[in-house]
Each structure stands twice: as C-alpha cells, then as structure tokens.
C-alpha cells in the first residue's frame, strides 16, 4: 500500500514518467494554478496560520478545514501566498492542496517527504532544499496544532 494519499500518489506517478524538461514545464503549470488554492471568502476554517518564516521569501497562510466525524475526518487545505513567493513554492502548494485533499489528518501526518525529489528532480531539491519541503511542513504543523487544540478542549 502506498504511503501517500491516492491523489498525491497519482501526481507523483505522473511526474515520475516525465523527462526533466517536462517535469519543469509541469511544475510551472502547477505553479500557475496556485491561486486556485487561495482561501475562499466567507468560508470558515478550523485553523488559520499566516506568517512569514525565514525559509520562505514571503508570507504564507495555511488554512485548514476538517470535515466529517472521527475516525473518518477529512482535511481540506487552502493556502495564501504573498507576491514574492517563488515558483517552486507555488507549484508545491498546488500539488499538496490537490494531493492531500480529503485525506485524514493521520494520513497527512504520515506522508513521507521522499516524494518531493520524485516530483521536482534531484537538482532542484539540492538548489532549493528549504523551499520544496516548506509547504508540506506547514501543513503537517497545522494538523498537529488542530489535534493539540482538540485534545486541550476535550481535557479542559
């Protein structure tokens, strides 16, 4: 069984079949779709984490919505990106919003980061090592924060 949620596994599989130049073109195409991942006006979120970190060139906001009941709760991410965010971060945002959509919190937390070089290629991982993992790290942090807040409310 794949360690990746099915939608992310399909994206990884697509990239693995592409030569390097087509991988870059496909990454640019995903980056162009990043605006579709932005938070929707008048939609409420269970967790919002907007900040500027050292690892990224601009502010990134992670918006987490959890639907359903335990143990089948599903996560839905929206991400706001500042205007200075790099193309690779935009591409990873789009890939992760699509690839992790409707996964369980637990599945998101278990996603190994080894899919990143399979998508972007080894060269870009070396050159942009912080950038390519940044959005995944933030999404996992949002899931952990949601679970911690939920535990505190249950124990409080």
Each PLM stretch: what is its role?
Residues 1-35:
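Charge-rich, low-complexity N-terminal segments
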Residues 58-68:
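Short beta-strand elements
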Residues 69-86, 97-101:
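Conserved interaction-surface patches within small, structured recognition/assembly domains
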Residues 106-156:
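C-terminal binding/interaction regions
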Residues 40-48:
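Short Pro/Gly-enriched beta-strand edge/turn motifs at strand-loop
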Residues 88-93:
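Catalytic-loop motifs flanking and including active-site residues across diverse enzymes
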Residues 95-109:
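Long, amphipathic alpha-helical coupling/dimerization segments that relay conformational signals between
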Residues 50-54:
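Short Gly/Pro-enriched turn/cap motifs at secondary-structure boundaries
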């Amino acid at each position: 069984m794949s360690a990746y949620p099915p939608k992310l596994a399909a994206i990884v599989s697509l990239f693995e079949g592409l030569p390097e130049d087509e991988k870059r073109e496909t990454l640019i195409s995903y980056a162009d779709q990043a605006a579709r991942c932005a938070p929707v006006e008048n939609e409420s979120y269970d967790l919002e984490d907007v900040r500027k970190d050292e690892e990224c060139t601009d502010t990134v906001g992670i918006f987490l919505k959890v639907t359903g009941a335990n143990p089948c709760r599903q996560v839905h991410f929206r991400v706001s990106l500042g205007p200075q965010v790099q193309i690779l971060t935009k591409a990873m945002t789009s890939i992760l919003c699509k690839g992790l959509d409707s996964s369980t919190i637990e599945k998101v937390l278990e996603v190994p980061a080894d899919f990143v070089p399979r998508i972007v290629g080894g060269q870009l991982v070396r050159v942009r090592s912080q950038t390519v993992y940044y959005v995944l790290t933030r999404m996992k942090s949002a899931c952990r924060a949601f679970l911690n807040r939920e535990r505190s409310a249950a124990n409080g």
